[in-house]
Design a protein with these regions (language model features):
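A broadly conserved sequence feature marking short terminus-proximal activation segments
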Residues: 1-51
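Juxtacatalytic helix/coil linker segments
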Residues: 34-142, 146
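Hydrophobic alpha-helical membrane-association signature
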Residues: 123, 127, 166-170, 174
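Catalytic core of nucleotidyl cyclases, primarily class III adenylyl/guanylyl cyclases
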Residues: 134-166, 177-203
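Charged, solvent-exposed alpha-helical segments that act as regulatory interaction surfaces
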Residues: 28, 89, 180-183
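Hydrophobic transmembrane alpha-helix bundles
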Residues: 40, 100-106, 171-186
């Protein structure tokens, strides 16, 4: 019979998320290490620079910082890879309030049936490219591409307390970029949704 008591001398169960505090501090922008690094790196010349740690991307200092792992991050080139590689090394995550953008091509199956595979692949790549540029411009991160869908996330560390407004602005910008703001038909039929709430963000 399980009494719920731990046998004397037995070890406690390991913490399933030992890095939660670190993740939370980084995701909500309160991590002291980033604050110290930013204080040092912002004095190095070389615009543009990482929006999180202020590492320069341009000039001689930018070349040096690239050698140190501070090259632009592919998922959002306004930030450096070093700011996110740390999280890759420490598996875990934290529940934080964040905003998400979901965008997909409406009627993609019918659309694909009406063109060659190469033409549809080109159209899909164009959609991905536009979505990435819109997310980057509004302090979002590309969370993932799933078929004809793009998912973006807006966290406090990057978009600050305005992450819901940033997600909404990105949604509007994506609709405009795909031609939904004019009198004619859009070059790509896209649907966009935004949600804000507490979510587990991590690896």
């Amino acid at each position: 019979m399980d009494t719920g008591r731990r046998a004397e001398g037995s070890k406690p169960d390991p913490d399933p998320n030992p890095n939660e505090a670190m993740w939370r501090a980084i995701l909500d922008g309160t991590d002291p290490v980033y604050a110290r690094n930013r204080g040092r790196l912002k004095h190095l010349p070389g615009a543009p620079r990482c929006k999180m740690c202020a590492a320069p991307f341009g000039g001689p200092a930018g070349i040096l910082m690239r050698w140190r792992g501070h090259a632009p991050w592919p998922n959002n080139p306004d930030y450096c890879g070093a700011c996110f590689q740390l999280l890759d090394r420490y598996h875990g995550g934290a529940e934080i309030e964040s905003s998400f953008l979901f965008a997909d091509i409406r009627g993609s199956t019918t659309l694909a049936e009406g063109m060659s595979p190469t033409a549809f692949r080109t159209l899909l790549d164009r959609f991905y490219d536009v979505a990435v540029r819109v997310l980057v411009a509004h302090d979002g991160i590309v969370d993932k591409f799933v078929g004809d869908e793009v998912v973006g996330i807006f966290i406090p560390a990057l978009a600050h307390d305005e992450h819901p407004a940033s997600a909404i602005a990105a949604a509007r910008a994506l609709l405009e970029a795909t031609g939904h703001d004019g009198p004619g038909e859009p070059w790509l039929p896209v649907g966009v949704g935004v949600a804000t709430g507490t979510a587990f963000v991590g690896s």
